[in-house]
Amino acid sequence: MNRPAWMTVAGCLLAWGLAAGATSAHAATGRPPNVVLILMDDMGWRDVGFMGNEFVETPHLDRLANRGLVFTQAYASAPNCAPTRACLMSGQVTPRHGIYTVVDPRQPPGSPWHKLRAADSRSELATEIVTLPEALRSKGYATAFFGMWNLGRGRTGPVTPGGQGFDTVVFPENLGFAKDAYFDDDGNQLSDRLTDEVLGFMERQKAGPFFVYLADHAIHAPYDPEPDLLAKYERKPAATGDQRNDAAQAATIEAVDRNVGRIMERLACLGIADDTLVIFTSDNGGTSRYTPPLKGGKGELSEGGIRVPLVVVGAAVAKPGTTCDVPVVSIDFYPTLLELAGAKPPAGQILDGTSLMPLLGGRANLDRRDLFWHFPCYVGRATPSSAIRAGRYKLVEFFEDGGRVELYDLSADPGERQDLAAKSPDIAKPLATRLRAWQRATAAALPDGPNPAYDAASDRPRGGGRRDAGKRR
């Protein structure tokens, strides 16, 4: 396997080290910047070093953070993978595109622990939606997709990446990997091989502009870590406090970190690091056993299920090495990248996000806005719910309990330990009213009445579906 360390070529190290002070080609020529969007699978808010994880080693991501802008209150648009990916491609909240979960949510007549019949969920992104790559192609971008799609079945056709705006498409299966496998039969690692393909594409398209969407399978369970990395973390002393100490997970994350380093090295070697905006984030939070100090995990609208790491580096970042505490959400990427590219919003298509260009440019805040999430389905232990965040307060509505709400002050209580709904009705009631008005305005699907198969004595699943044991080669 090709495993170069960060900046193995001295000239590349110098090139990226000076990038922040260089005059970019896009600024000099008017050509739009390149974009590399790296989306991880199930990576929690605190699963990387630059967010305070002291057990896993992520030197390349930490370097990215030191050279970029870290968003400390970044959110996925949904608590599980497919809807977040649909939000990224459409720029719309989940009720508009109708994708709420990656699996069939209804499971007729319903699992015995489901009190309600889950709302229906689309299995593919509607072709009428103008996707982000389609919008960028209108400005001359070469577009490429690598990894997991989850927005339509098949390898060719209108609902696949090739039919939704990507010129180049590479699935794991194209590289000889079985579904959900971390290694192929020859011992090649998936993150390495996907990155090989990304590097080749960037080399071919170095004249730009290009848009790369790398949707890695990592760090989805079951893990299958590289033996040498696994042994390293099994020998490593445990971190203290609420730090996670999962050797298999840490080894999987370090392999991802290595490949982020390879991408940044290649951008520098090609002389286009300063002409490229790199975004690194995750599709949802980790699982409830892996998200401290946050509560809950994947599938849930608690902070542990939707808060994610986010770092942006390169073109348009005015103050490298800084942090931003403004709450942002992944539907913001679509309008941000349109503005970066100088592209107009698609005619007749609602975009629910807000451009982050002012924040990237050094502004301290955005205009005040509410953030919304809607999940009328079941995944793991998660039940149908909807949420609003307005400033420091977040309110969650639980549909199983007749619309019961919980209210949290995230500034004082980011772990959501103290429910303020009963003691602060003056805050909870207006937020609930705004949330329900938003549900009506977006025609949000709701659970479809009681589940006839419900059995109060049945046991719920033990978490968000993550398994510790990996598939061994």
What are the functions of these language-model segments?
Residues 285-292, 298-301, 318-322, 326, ...:
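C-terminal cap/loop subdomain of S1 sulfatases and analogous C-terminal strand-loop tails that border
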Residues 25, 29-33, 40, 45, ...:
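Long, internal low-complexity/basic segments
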Residues 56, 156-165, 222-225, 265-318, ...:
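Histidine-centered active-site microenvironments of extracellular/periplasmic hydrolases
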Residues 30-34, 88, 140, 144, ...:
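Active-site regions of oxyanion-processing enzymes, predominantly non-cytosolic
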Residues 46-131, 135, 141, 155-156, ...:
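Active-site segment of extracytoplasmic enzymes that catalyze sulfate/phosphate-ester chemistry
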Residues 8-21:
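Bacterial N-terminal signal peptides
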Residues 31, 53-57, 75-80, 103, ...:
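A short beta-strand-to-alpha-helix junction
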Residues 51-54, 70-92, 100-106, 145-159, ...:
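Short, solvent-exposed turn/loop segments enriched in Gly/Ser/Thr/Pro and often Arg
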